[in-house]
Amino acid sequence: MSFTTKDKSDDSSIITTNYADNPNLSPIEQKILQQYQLMNNNLIKVSNELELLTNTTDEFGKGKGSSIHLVENLRQLETKLVFVYTFFKGAVYSILNAQDYIAEQETNGLEETNEEEDGNEEDESGNVELSGVSADEN
């Protein structure tokens, strides 16, 4: 299948023809041709936009086209997002680790306090016994 290119004059006649004024066409044919005309205009716009995006140079013949700029910018953004994600993950890990450390210290502190309270027992006379040694024995 081969495609042939038409002159711009052929395209402009298709675009500018007013099918509503043509007496040889039925109203349905007029509407169908107007819809084809509208679709043709939209396809031309899409084609022009795609051509701008896929150009390897800008309008002045220098530098890179907009699609290449977009791809490069997206790559840079992706790299930055990876760094941000890594730093965020590290910060969250650090916070969780600090919370675990604090909870562990509190647990150890409570255990030591309980051990001290268990080791210091008072007898009936109010004397404090330290690890089995009473104050009276001194």
Swiss-Prot record:
Pfam families named in the record: DASH_Dad3 (PF08656)
Alphabetized InterPro entries for the sequence: DASH_Dad3
Gene it is expressed from: DAD3
Region (Disordered): 1-20, 106-138
Tagged with keyword Cell division: yes
Compositionally biased region (Basic and acidic residues): 1-11
Main location: nucleus
Cell compartment(s), UniProt: Nucleus; Cytoplasm, Cytoskeleton, Spindle; Chromosome, Centromere, Kinetochore
Gene Ontology CC terms: cytoplasm; DASH complex; microtubule; mitotic spindle
Keyword annotations from UniProtKB, A to Z: Cell cycle, Cell division, Centromere, Chromosome, Chromosome partition, Coiled coil, Cytoplasm, Cytoskeleton, Kinetochore, Microtubule, Mitosis, Nucleus
Gene Ontology BP annotations: attachment of spindle microtubules to kinetochore; cell division; filamentous growth; mitotic sister chromatid biorientation; mitotic spindle organization; protein transport along microtubule to mitotic spindle pole body
Function: Component of the DASH complex that connects microtubules with kinetochores and couples microtubule depolymerisation to chromosome movement; it is involved in retrieving kinetochores to the spindle poles before their re-orientation on the spindle in early mitosis and allows microtubule depolymerization to pull chromosomes apart and resist detachment during anaphase.
Family that this chain belongs to: Belongs to the DASH complex DAD3 family.
Subunit annotation: Component of the DASH complex consisting of ASK1, DAD1, DAD2, DAD3, DAD4, DAM1, DUO1, HSK3, SPC19 and SPC34, with a stoichiometry of one copy of each subunit per complex. Multiple DASH complexes oligomerize to form a ring that encircles spindle microtubules and organizes the rod-like NDC80 complexes of the outer kinetochore. DASH complex oligomerization strengthens microtubule attachments. On cytoplasmic microtubules, DASH complexes appear to form patches instead of rings.
Coiled coil (UniProt feature): 30-59
Protein name, as recorded: DASH complex subunit DAD3
Bias (Acidic residues) ranges: 112-126
